[in-house]
Amino acid sequence: MKRTYQPNNRKRAKTHGFRARMKTKSGRNILARRRAKGRHQLTVSDE
C-alpha cells in the first residue's frame, strides 16, 4: 500500500510557502501569529 506522505519540495512550497501564506487573509494571520510567538522559521520557505 502506498503511504500518504510522498515528499515533494515544490508541492511543499506551493502549499505552505511564504507566498502561499501571503495570498490569503487567514494565511497572513498564520504569519502574524508565528511572528508574535517569535518563531525562528515562519514558513517552510525559510529553511
UniProtKB/Swiss-Prot annotation:
<dbReference type="GO" id="GO:0005840">
    <property type="term" value="C:ribosome"/>
</dbReference>
<dbReference type="Pfam" id="PF00468">
    <property type="entry name" value="Ribosomal_L34"/>
</dbReference>
<comment type="function">
    <text>Binds the 23S rRNA.</text>
</comment>
<dbReference type="InterPro" id="IPR020939">
    <property type="entry name" value="Ribosomal_bL34_CS"/>
</dbReference>
<dbReference type="GO" id="GO:1990904">
    <property type="term" value="C:ribonucleoprotein complex"/>
</dbReference>
<dbReference type="GO" id="GO:0006412">
    <property type="term" value="P:translation"/>
</dbReference>
<dbReference type="GO" id="GO:0003735">
    <property type="term" value="F:structural constituent of ribosome"/>
</dbReference>
<keyword id="KW-0689">Ribosomal protein</keyword>
<dbReference type="InterPro" id="IPR000271">
    <property type="entry name" value="Ribosomal_bL34"/>
</dbReference>
<dbReference type="GO" id="GO:0019843">
    <property type="term" value="F:rRNA binding"/>
</dbReference>
<keyword id="KW-0687">Ribonucleoprotein</keyword>
<protein>
    <recommendedName>
        <fullName>Large ribosomal subunit protein bL34</fullName>
    </recommendedName>
</protein>
<comment type="subunit">
    <text>Part of the 50S ribosomal subunit. Contacts protein L4.</text>
</comment>
<comment type="similarity">
    <text>Belongs to the bacterial ribosomal protein bL34 family.</text>
</comment>
<keyword id="KW-0694">RNA-binding</keyword>
<keyword id="KW-0699">rRNA-binding</keyword>
